[in-house]
Structure formats: structure tokens, C-alpha cells
Amino acid sequence: CIRDRPNPTVSNVKAGVEAFASSGADFILAIGGGSSMDTAKAIGIITNNPEFSDVVSLEGVADTKKKSVPIIALPTTAGTAAEVTINYVITDEQNQKKMVCVDPNDIPSIAIVDAELMYTLPKSLTAATGLDALTHAIEGLITKGAWEMSDMFEIKAIEMINRYLVTAVEEPSNAEARNGMAVAQYLSLIHISEPTRL
């Protein structure tokens, strides 16, 4: 069991790779928000592509050859859609910067999005992750790769966030609002996975 932290670091990932190797496990179970998903993706990719000795060598578009260790993702937030995207963000403590790693081989094998797992998320995090999804949707509309089909998803995401976010914050156990936000955050990140190839 690896307990990651917000904004996972290179050293978190290194510790996770070592823990996974010594565990004898066949898969990684990632439970939490975007940071948990990002940590799991980095651990899974490095484990199956040991020529990349640490996550720093994966910054940018990674040239891995093998798919990640199987990852089962159970998100507890609705904001990053990290459970279904090809990128992850890790903090390089030594150089004091965040690294974006892009790799189609890192997508979790299974993503189980259950709104009930989000019921106990504090109001402040519900709001913050919801605004993260909104930011991603707006970004998707203005990115160079946007086109009519990706715009359709981003506009729908913005409409759903407008409809459900306040209710999800004010009524944390409202299933309709939580499900709506779970779908909206997914739609808001579709542009990350190659918007011109939808």
C-alpha cells in the first residue's frame, strides 16, 4: 500500500516502484484523485519499462515500448479524469518543477467510476476539482487541435458542470449531481487524448 500525497514527487514514484516490485502483486489498485492516478501510472510504466530508470526520463512524450502494469482506477474526485487519460504530472523536487508525461501505454486497464465514492469528498475539494474540470473544458475549446467534434464534448461538459457542480458542493450525497460531474469531467478531458482523432 502506497499512500501518495497531493502533487506526487519523483521520490514518491521511486518508492512506489520499489514497493510494487517487492510486493509480488499483479496489478495496481489506484484509489483517490488525480494525484493517486498519476502516481499509479508512473509506477506501472516504469515497472514494465525498466530502461526508464526514473520518471524524469519520461517527461514529455514518452517512448515506452510496453503497456503499464495493469491498473484498476477508482477515482474519488471529479476533476482530472486521470483514470482515462494518457498523461500524468509528477513534481521534480530537485529542479522544483512539475513534469508532464504523455504516454498512451499508461492508461489504466479498468476505470470504475462510482459516484458514491465521492460522497465524502469535502466541499472545498468538490468545488476545486469541479473547477479543474471546467478549466479543462475551456482549454479544450481554445486548444489548437480543437475541432467540431471535440468542441461538442467540451460544450456539453461546461453545460453539465453549470448544472451539477453547485448541487454536488451543497448536497454531497446527491447521486444525480455526483454522476453528472463524473461524466462532465470525463467529457472535459477528451481533448487530451488526441482531439484531432476522435
What is the predicted role of each segment?
Residues 49-147:
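A glycine/threonine-rich phosphate-anchoring loop and its flanking beta-alpha core
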Residues 3-51, 167-178:
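N-terminal small/polar loop signature for handling phosphorylated ligands or for N-terminal nucleophile
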Residues 5-8, 35, 122, 126, ...:
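Catalytic cores of large soluble enzymes that bind and process phosphate-bearing ligands
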Residues 2-4, 190-191:
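Short, low-complexity export/processing leader segments characterized by acidic and small residues
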